[in-house]
Amino acid sequence: MTLADPALPRPRLILASASPRRFDLLSGAGLSPDAVEPTHIDEHEIPGELPGPLALRLAQEKAMAHPGSDDAFILAADTVVGVGRRILPKTETEAEARRCLDLLSGRNHRVFTGIAARGPDNRFAARVVETRVKFKRLSQPEIDAYIASGEWRGKAGGYAIQGRAGCFVINLIGSFTGVVGLPLYETANLLTGLGYPVTARMGEGGSA
């Protein structure tokens, strides 16, 4: 018998992230987490580390930091914005956010979201998803208004594409949900590969 067998209780899905955006994305796809249990790790980059490998490493470390459960799948993720080899911060101050927006204005950048999952049998899978985004050239009043909104706080690269900053995007190649914080297509494939009943959950409409 398999985990997807209707005779067996459905395994739980634990989101090892405090991000409300990731919770909402999963819920909207019919994959509402049964619990939110963030893990805490050192998120500083290693000297010389590139944006993509950083996102993947942090997602893996978050998933492995969870104690696990014999009836649950653990899902973790991390998003990193990069301009070339440069890693942009998750902005906490207006000055940081302003520097990020000045740098992104009129330029292409890349958003990397690492995803990692562990099954009840401790099987593990992870990958990183890259999306290319181009911003319009931002005027000073636009930057000032965005800073005043506070939407940038705690966001990778100092912006939230699903909010006001969506008006800044000229072009996007890749996963929109990956930029928001969790690439749904790749996440569903990752969980399915580990034995989580993704399709059955979608049929439930996300009900637990």
Swiss-Prot record:
The protein's enzyme class: hydrolase
Catalysis performed (reactions): dTTP + H2O = dTMP + diphosphate + H(+); UTP + H2O = UMP + diphosphate + H(+)
GO terms, molecular function: dTTP diphosphatase activity; UTP diphosphatase activity
Cofactor(s) the protein requires to work: a divalent metal cation
Signal sequence bounds: none
Keyword Transmembrane: no
Annotated site (Important for substrate specificity): 21, 79, 162
Official protein name in the record: dTTP/UTP pyrophosphatase
Organism for this UniProt entry: Maricaulis maris (strain MCS10)
